[in-house]
Regions:
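Short helix/loop capping segments that flank catalytic or ligand/cofactor-binding pockets
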Residues: 5-10, 30-33, 50, 111-113, ...
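Short glycine-rich anion-binding loops that position phosphate/pyrophosphate groups of nucleotides
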Residues: 1-5, 26, 106-108, 158, ...
């Protein structure tokens, strides 16, 4: 699909010299690193049905073991403390079945990316906005209205303050909505 939002994955892909396969429904080529690639214009689920997974290769065992080690290490470090890292790490515990997750500030998006393993296929939305903090409550309400599914929204304190008027939009949401406001002093964006 399109470009990843993860800074670490984008850095890895920028330096990667191997073969790229891109499965993208759109005809538009998104290739910021100008790598040679094989493109498949198809819906991802159609392509996956036509191309069953390859058997696990021996070289994959080491990264899988490292991944398990990292998951255990993160659990030990984050543990039961109540802070941004623990909320990001344990976020899957509050996700409703057949719901949607909305992540609404850049620091928390990065923490979820680094510290948690979300259920496979669980829909996740985010919106950076023009300034990175505007319109996030409105976006979460719009997702709830459009999808007609339960929504869990994680939004930073400054982002919430900038969009308080959009709370009125939630009167049009028919499914349960949980809004977590992360009190993190603006995610330290003003400390630079």
């Amino acid at each position: 699909g399109s470009r990843f939002i993860s800074k670490r994955i984008n850095q890895f892909l920028a330096e990667f010299q191997g073969e790229f396969w891109v499965v993208e429904q759109s005809q538009n080529a998104v290739d910021p690193n100008h790598h040679t690639q094989t493109r498949f214009n198809a819906k991802a689920h159609h392509w996956l049905r036509a191309h069953p997974p390859l058997r696990q290769k021996p070289w994959l065992l080491e990264p899988l073991a490292l991944s398990k080690f990292c998951a255990t290490f993160i659990e030990q470090q984050v543990g039961g403390n109540l802070n941004e890292a623990s909320l990001a790490h344990h976020i899957e515990r509050v996700l409703p079945y057949n719901g949607i997750l909305f992540l609404g500030n850049s620091l928390f998006v990065r923490l979820v990316d680094a510290l948690t393993k979300l259920p496979e296929g669980y829909p996740i939305y985010t919106n950076r906005g023009a300034s990175g903090i505007d319109g996030l409550l409105a976006t979460a309400a719009g997702i709830g209205i459009g999808a007609d599914q339960p929504v869990v929204a994680m939004i930073g304190d400054t982002s919430t303050l900038y969009d308080l008027n959009s709370l009125a939009l939630f009167k049009n949401v028919t499914q349960p909505t949980i809004i977590f406001v992360i009190n993190n002093n603006g995610g330290a964006i003003f400390d630079m």
